[in-house]
Amino acid sequence: TEHEKPGVREAGLFYLIMTHVGTAFIILTLLIFSQETGSFSFEAFRHPDQQLPEGLRSIAFFTALIGFGAKAGIVPLHVWLPYAHPAAPSHISALMSGVMIKTAIYGLIRVYFDFMGGVFPWWWGFTLLVAGTVSALLGVMYALMEHDLKGLLAFHSVENIGIILLGIGAGMIFHTYGLHELAALGLLAGLYHTINHAAFKALLFLGAGALQFSTHTRHIEEYGGLLRRMPWTGAFFLIGAVSIAALPPTNGFVSEWLVFQSLFLSFQLPTLFLKLMLPIAAAMLALTGALALACFAKAFGMSFLAQPRSAHARHATEVPWSMRVGMGFLAGLCIVLGLAPMLVVPLLDRVTAPLTGAAISSQVLALDGWVVAPVTVEFSSISTPVLAMLLVGAGALGLLIARLCGKGLRARYYKTWGCGLNLTPRMEYTATGFAQPIKQVFETIYQPTVKL
């Protein structure tokens, strides 16, 4: 059984240690509040007459960041994620990544915006901004080098937690300087991405579980040609891959676009340092997005396209309908959350408005929700329903032109010339080869792993 495997036991012990470290710092944070208020009641924590002294507030900031950061997987406290996710059953991995690590985001917001009364220095938000940037960039860079599919998805959880922190950090900075509408925008963007990540990451982990169920392996190098054998799983996995790569019109695009806009609005800040730092964070987020797209081009292409590279892949069959239903529901949710932000933004606005003092739902949504804008449409705006219609229209037009131009022509099929040799799966481009150019570009970051 699974619990008898040394790797599973090691992962379980590592996760146990890390989660207890996180819990210890969370308890320490609550004890700091309790010591000053004389109560463990959340209502007492937020009482205006019992605010913490400045020194204790900063200590509570760091203890909360370490405690909830260990739960969320913020770099450098992320080390348990690549161990725990591959070892856990896929449906548990979906639950851990989709729900469990998101409770840490709730905890951070609850402490900083609620218990602290939303009163904090600018460097608190900047600390979250730096932590988010580092987590997003390093998470996706290590995901590119990972060929265990569930390990790859685990590193992408680190990346997306970083993206969420970018929105929250920007919101905290704006809130410090009294820019309440922009603070609400950053916080709303972070929460929107929290929901979206729960949807597409759960979908991808269920997809990885379906592949493991049919092929008995998690290694991408042993996949290939699975789209013909597992068309439903392939279609659902593709939707998840497009969503996590933040391509329109899926949900990941909307929330990541809002995070970008909150960072670009830094020109309204009064200090030159922050005016420069937030766009730099946006540039790092853009690099993260490009690397995420490359990573899932690798993950999907090497898994589902070309020829099978192992006997397991050659004999793979589609998973039962009971496994497809969950993936289908989450795939539909990824599309709905992308096409219908008017269903999500008002709900999130009810959360962010009391915390930031600004209700922005009517400003973010224009034309009855068909257009999403960062507080004002004069700055920028986007419409995912219109983008979806344009994409469908462009595809239909391309097919029509191809049919008209090819009318009367007979299709001819030939084998690709292989220099006189029969092509075999060993000649295919591998996941390792796909990631090699990026590894060489960032070779100073990639270092050998030493297990003690």
Regions found by a protein language model. Give the residues of each.
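Short, non-transmembrane cytosolic segments of multipass membrane proteins
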Residues: 438-452
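Alpha-helical transmembrane segments and their membrane-interface junctions
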Residues: 243-258, 333-351, 448
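Hydrophobic transmembrane alpha-helices and their helix-loop junctions in integral membrane proteins
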Residues: 1-319
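Cytoplasmic/organellar membrane-interface segments at the starts of transmembrane helices
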Residues: 4, 221-237, 288-440
